[in-house]
Amino acid sequence: MNTPLTRKPLVLGLLLATGLGTGNAVAQLEEVIVTAQKRTESLQDIPIAIAAYNAENIESMGLFNAQDVGMASPSVQMPLYPTAGNNLALFIRGIGNADSVVITKDPTVGVYYDGVYAARSTGLLADLSDLERIEILRGPQGTLYGRNTTAGAINFINVKPTGELGFKQVLGAGNYGSWRSISHLNLDDIGGFKAKFTASFSERDGWVDNRGPNTIPGLDYTDYYLRETQGFRVALRYDGLENLVVDYSYDYSDMTSSPGYHQYGGPVGGLNPAFQPITDSFRDRLEETRSPIGGQPTAYYLPETDTEVDGHNLTVDWAISDSLTLKSITGYREFDDDASQNFTESFGNAGSLEVWTVTEHEQFTQELQLLGNQDRFQWVAGLYYFEEEGTQTEQQYLDRATVDLTGIIALDLTTFPPTPCSDGSTSDPFCSDFTMFFPLYLGEYAVDVDNESWAAFGQATWNATERLDLTAGLRYTDDEREAVRTHDGLLWNSFGPGVSASDLDETDYTLIADYRWTDDISTYAKVSTGFRSGGSSRNGLDFNQAFDKETVISYELGWKTELLDQRLRLNGAIYYMEVDDIILDYLPDPVNNPQFVEVFNSGEAEINGVELDVTWAMTENLLVGFNYAYLDYDIKDAIFPDGSDRSDTTGLVWAPEHAWAASVDWSIPMGFGEWLLHADYSWQDDQLALANTNFGEVLVEDFGLLNARASISGIEMLGGDWQLALWMKNVTDEEDVSYAIGATSFTFLMPRTYGAELIFEF
């Protein structure tokens, strides 16, 4: 939009904010600056449903990692991946990828670090340590962002060097042995060269103790939910030549963790595969590992999960003239992930499933942008190239066999009972004659992927009148993929070898009409498309059977308003999406064979919803926020691999019908500083964690979380500015289920956590 607005030139998060300054006679919302359309613009001026958080928001809300951001955004779900402690699944508007760790299946939410696309979400749980802003774009972004953004995109924009000597230190400690340290150092400008260095460290003990009398010396029994991270970032900038800015950055993260603890919550009675009675069902959150056979404390073998991620980014920005800019973004990222999970005995009759997954991945991206601003036209044209290579190896074990495992191995305990123990019985699964069979090695398989993609795109906005803007965009993509699966050659290994390859092209477009009724009220109508690449079922029985691309078209009506003299911001959107050849996961037997996942295309999904974002500066010192998301869907022509039509029973996972978040920020000026009190509450409706199985749906019931933070800042002493803060998460200590697999395996919300932070800056 061309119409100028009088706003404060500061960046502030849309949904929740830290509070208002005390120097204004009249409260007024601060302007939100974003780069969602590849150029710097006010959030109120762009026809995109978007949430933005700046560095102050991240600090005042106590957002330690990306999952915290997801809880504050009702349209976004970020469940922790069940077998990898450093990986999140990403969903926006009901579209996502539950198997986010699998390298043969692409995401639906694009993740970008300073403009560089990250093909995999491994390492997304690294500490948020040096961010200027987070932008969450909702809805298909196929034109400007490309493939695999059918649900939306998340931009992580890091702070650039200032060229002025400065230092900031964050020190924190809390319960469960947690502590964190973040250090920032800016150096003086030397001949146009600027530099900034950041180091972050954090640690938290596991909150589920993995202990028991059955431990064996020399084996690892890591507590569940352990986290330890360290990261470094170097940012360099050169702007010594007129009209030229060169930014280079290197980031490194090393994360050690353990996954979530899956409790047995199924029925009691009956016998497990070792002919022991299942006597206990744990429907309440445990903080120590226990066996459903007798309920006694039991240790489960569990090594730590180790993840290393690093990346290089080179951005060159050349202002050719006042109206023309050439921009180059070059990125290289890689990660190594060694993940372990022991599902304990949470599957009941399947014994204790143990999974080890090792992933090595590297990618290269190059993007060229030409941006223009002539008279009544603003436009961008570009070329994009992407390639990735990766290897993923997985081993699976059972601590004992089960009568339902005959499809995996030729061993049936009802036909071939265990060898009698020395006393003639077969009741003791740990006697010497019986343990020769266990732990039962189900096999190892490896998948190698080699993917390449290139695209050409352009988008232009025409200021047709002083009030009306018309936008059109187009993107052409060519996508080539190849994946090869090999295995260890054992006869009972069901993950047989295979090759999957595809070569496709797709054209996406965007059409927008944006009308400003007044300087503070605008509405827009938008049509946009996107596609998600096809792939292969890493954990499927037939690896040669690939699945095709998934396409989406979205129709959206939105509004951006600032009322009451810019004290009330009321934004929203109504959308309808059609997803064709929808990619679905099919688990034939999640209770006994949870490792089998068939991925396939079937039918279409119709998704519609409403989103509302409200920010109100009630007084000069009191700010409230409210955000709401409604979602409904219908799936048609869902023909499953077994030939059955399951349109009436097929569901989308992590797609709650209702979700909302509310916040309050109250600033209290004092003679020696300023108090800031923050509280936020987020709630999500019932949602499916697992669907499309032969055993029915797996539901995670609704839950809400209350968080709070109190700080006093602006304390000047010892030559710097000091801040002291106290924080608490899950204030009411809710014990709801957070993830479920099958009808018996559940994880729970983290207990109440609390801590203190000391921040020093000069």
Model regions: which residues?
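Outer-membrane beta-barrel translocator/receptor signature
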Residues: D106-T108, R120, L128-R138, T143-L219, ...
